[in-house]
């Protein structure tokens, strides 16, 4: 970055969960941070007040493991949740949808976009969030109802302390 004159652009490699090297940033970019590593990166971006967040999530296993047969909404979604492949894909989409909603709750205008054709990679979802400092109305109740219905507790909600009904 320095060789191109970007002296304020920094790249860091390591475990984001415990990283404490900065107090604020302009932009956070994540690419294929596996499972809850994406959640830790998004939580740090919110904590640092990043003006822009660009995140391409990778594998999303957390909610797949949390959706159990005892969940309140399991019977209604049995046509999807009874089949491993469908449950895995549903959990991945649900994870990214909830991440988008948590970012909206945190004052970001958020979009979920396809950033590359499916023929190149099935992991082609981009979460694009721009800070507005205005929480989107209704997103908290939507997330709460979804969590209650499926009996899930997403990591990003825990990290952002959005784990209870408001």
Regions found by a protein language model. Give the residues of each.
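Class I S-adenosyl-L-methionine
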Residues: 1-166
């Amino acid at each position: 970055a320095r060789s191109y004159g970007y002296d304020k652009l920094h790249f860091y490699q390591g475990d984001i969960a415990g990283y404490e090297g900065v107090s604020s940033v302009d932009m956070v970019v994540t690419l294929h941070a596996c499972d809850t590593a994406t959640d830790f990166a998004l939580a740090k971006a919110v904590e640092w007040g990043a003006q822009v967040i660009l995140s391409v999530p990778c594998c999303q296993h957390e909610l797949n493991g949390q959706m159990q047969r005892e969940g309140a909404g399991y019977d209604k979604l049995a046509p999807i949740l009874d089949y491993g492949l469908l449950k895995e894909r549903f959990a991945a989409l649900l994870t990214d949808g909830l991440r988008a909603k948590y970012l909206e709750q945190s004052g970001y205008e958020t979009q979920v976009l396809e950033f590359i054709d499916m023929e190149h990679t099935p992991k082609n979802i981009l979460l694009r969030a721009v800070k507005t400092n205005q929480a989107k109305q209704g997103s908290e109740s939507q997330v709460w109802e979804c969590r209650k219905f499926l009996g899930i507790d997403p990591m990003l909600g825990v990290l952002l302390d959005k784990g209870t009904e408001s």
